[in-house]
Structure formats: structure tokens, C-alpha cells
Amino acid sequence: MFTRNMTIADYDPVLWQAIQDENRRQEEHIELIASENYASPRVMEAQGSQFTNKYAEGYPGKRYYGGCEYADIVEQLAIDRAKELFGADYVNVQPHSGSQANAAVYGALINAGDTILGMDLAHGGHLTHGAKVSFSGKIYNSVLYGITADGLIDYEDVRQKALECKPKLIVAGFSAYSQVVDWAKMREIADEVGAYLFVDMAHVAGLIAAGLYPNPLPHAHVVTTTTHKTLGGPRGGLILSSCGDEEIYKKLQSSVFPANQGGPLVHIIAAKAVCFKEALEPQYKEYQANVIKNAKAMVEVFKQRGYDVVSNGTENHLFLVSFIKQGLTGKAADAALGKANITVNKNAVPNDPQKPFVTSGIRVGTPSVTRRGSNENDVRELAGWMCDVLDALGKENEEQVIAETKEKVLAICKRLPVYPK
């Protein structure tokens, strides 16, 4: 028998301690990983609801199990809110992750062995955009495009590659690109070679929802996103379209269920519904505007301190710092900043001489630090502290600078808690 007062703390102290330690880590570290964000207590409440117990194979009104009347309400709420948020005609809220959403799109639109054209992982793409270690590069014949030495997409190069390889599908989107993608140009290229245009907007979905980054839906046949990252919801996936082709919509439905997944995670769909409602609130646009302002403010500090920023700036929530000129590695920078309670991730940069697990750069993102309430002055100060640590790498005062920076970080974390009590 279960009772409502059962707790993990009483039952599994080792697990409970890990949870408490993670709570403390998040409160005491400044999070600058571009793909991470803080979900609201409302989102987490939905994830912990009794919808955890419910199996609901199928779609609203067409379930394979009984007792789904409330699951139908939840899923339809999420669908309707996502349609309103992004201006979509078709929405599927069931994908468990962004990668599974992408797999469903491939399965719906093309066949095994068909050619796809996507952004190279080393140039800012994603594993699922055709990387050879991913299903997208194993099941399909993937051809990759990259960026210029200036860190920008060369659309003429994309066009030439498309004309040469004649892909069935072109993937636009990124995991580490700080500029605005010309969705219309990508569609023009796709139309020229008779390919589908598939956009993965996972990193910028929150900015798009707020109207601060171009919406790909008017241009793409199909769009996917995660529901965390800039969007700030639970970890999950989403498929959208406004192409007007009912046949494509039917294929997408069946490619998610039953082709790629069984029962949907109704508790996560409930959390997605909460997230979409939050994103429709007026203050959400202000938050996303501050995300971009903070990223731009940090970029200026890094440049003033002599560090190269890929593409010389940012128009979204992230940017890449290159250490090629300084002879530093992303791995060393990541580790040193981590000791100072500043969390980033090492990242390859254009013409990177280092191996993928070492790299010559870091990726910095501002969704989480902005969610804490940090303003432009706060993040300028933070970027300066980061440069202090980077300047000290390999020098006698390295540990002293790290220790001093950590104290400053702890102070700002105390002033701006993630979840104020």
C-alpha cells in the first residue's frame, strides 16, 4: 500500500542525497550551457503528477486503452497551445525527445538510404543532422555542409552541395550557431533540387515563440524542437508544420506512433502544456529579450579582453569563444571555469586544430543565468570573471584566481537564487 507521506528521504537516502546535492549544485553554480534552462515549479509539478501512471497509446479520441478521457484533455491542451504559440496547423506533442522527433520526421518523409544534407556537427550542427555516429548518418546517406572561416553559413556552398548530391531532405538548424539562419533561402535551395526542408529549431524555439527570431514554419515542410532549452519546459520533443499537406501530417502521426514510439509520456505532455501557457504570457517576451541582451553583453566583454568570438557576435542566446589565438583548449577552460562554479561546455570552433574531446573553444549560453534574474551589468561582471580565470590558465596564480572567482560566483548565486524560498 502507498501513502501520500512516503518520501525518498526515508526510503533511499543515497538517492536522496544525490538529489539534494544536485539541488545545491544548481543553486551554487552559474549555468551557461546553452542547451540548459530552469523549468518552473509548475512544470515540475505536472511531471510529478499521477499522469505518470497512465498509458495512453494512440491520439486524443483514438486511444487503444480505456480511461484516457483526462489524458485526452491534457494532450489537446498542449496541441492547441503549441499551435497558438508558433502559428502551426499541425502539432504532435508526443515525441519523448528532440532526437526522437527528428527520427520520426525522417521516417515520415524519406526512406533508408536516401540522401540528406545537414550541418556538420563540427561546424555547429547536431548529431541527428547526419553525423556518421548517429542513426541519421547510418540509416541515411548524409552529406554535410559547414560554415566559413568567419563562422557564417555559406548559402552558395549549401546550394552547390545540394545540386551535386540531390538530397531528398535538407536539414536546417543547429546546436552551436550564433547568427540568424535564412530559412527562406534554405527553402529556395530545397525547392531548386526538389527536396523537403526540415528545420530543427530546438535551440531558438523560445526566441521564436517570443517573436525575437525568425519563425521557420512559413518556409519549412516540417519543424521540430525540444521543449527545454530556450523554451524552458520539460525535457521532451515536439513536431510542427504549416505546410498544408494533409498527407504529410498523416505520415508524421504514424511515424511517431506506432512507428517510433509506443505509449506517450502523459505527465510530460502535461508539463509541456504548462510550458506553452507560460510562453504565451506577456512577461515571457521580456525574458527572451533579456536572454539576447545578456548574450550580446557578454560577447562585448570577451572581445574587449582579447578573445575571439566566432562570427564576431551573436543574434541569439549563445556564442562560441575561440582560444586558438591564445593556444588554450576548450577542455582546460571548461575544467577551470567549473572549479569556479561556472558551468560551460567545451566546443569545436572553425578550423579547430584540436580533437573533438579537447577542442579550442567553449560554448556559452544565457537562458539559465537570465532566468535567475541576471541583467546586463551582472553578466558583464560575470564575463570579466571568466576572462580572469582564462587569463590565469597555466600561470602561478591560477588556483588563487579560481578561488577568488568562486567566492564572487557564490555571492551572486545567493543574491539571485534559482528557486527563491
Swiss-Prot record:
Main localisation: cytoplasm
Keyword Cytoplasm in annotation: yes
Keyword Nucleus: no
Keywords: Amino-acid biosynthesis, Cytoplasm, One-carbon metabolism, Pyridoxal phosphate, Transferase
Positions annotated to bind (6S)-5,6,7,8-tetrahydrofolate: L121, G125, H126, L127
EC numbers for this chain: 2.1.2.1
Transmembrane segments: none
Cofactor(s) the protein requires to work: pyridoxal 5'-phosphate
InterPro entries for the chain: PyrdxlP-dep_Trfase (IPR015424), PyrdxlP-dep_Trfase_major (IPR015421), PyrdxlP-dep_Trfase_small (IPR015422), Ser_HO-MeTrfase (IPR001085), Ser_HO-MeTrfase-like (IPR049943), Ser_HO-MeTrfase_PLP_BS (IPR019798), SHMT-like_dom (IPR039429)
GO biological process, one term: glycine biosynthetic process from serine
Localization in the cell: Cytoplasm
Listed GO CC annotations: cytosol
Pathway participation: One-carbon metabolism; tetrahydrofolate interconversion; Amino-acid biosynthesis; glycine biosynthesis; glycine from L-serine: step 1/1
Marked site positions, Plays an important role in substrate specificity: H228
Cross-referenced NCBIfam families: PRK00011.1
Function of the molecule: Catalyzes the reversible interconversion of serine and glycine with tetrahydrofolate (THF) serving as the one-carbon carrier. This reaction serves as the major source of one-carbon groups required for the biosynthesis of purines, thymidylate, methionine, and other important biomolecules. Also exhibits THF-independent aldolase activity toward beta-hydroxyamino acids, producing glycine and aldehydes, via a retro-aldol mechanism.
Self-association state and partner proteins as the record states: Homodimer.
Name the UniProt record assigns to this protein: Serine hydroxymethyltransferase
Organism the protein comes from: Haemophilus influenzae (strain PittEE)
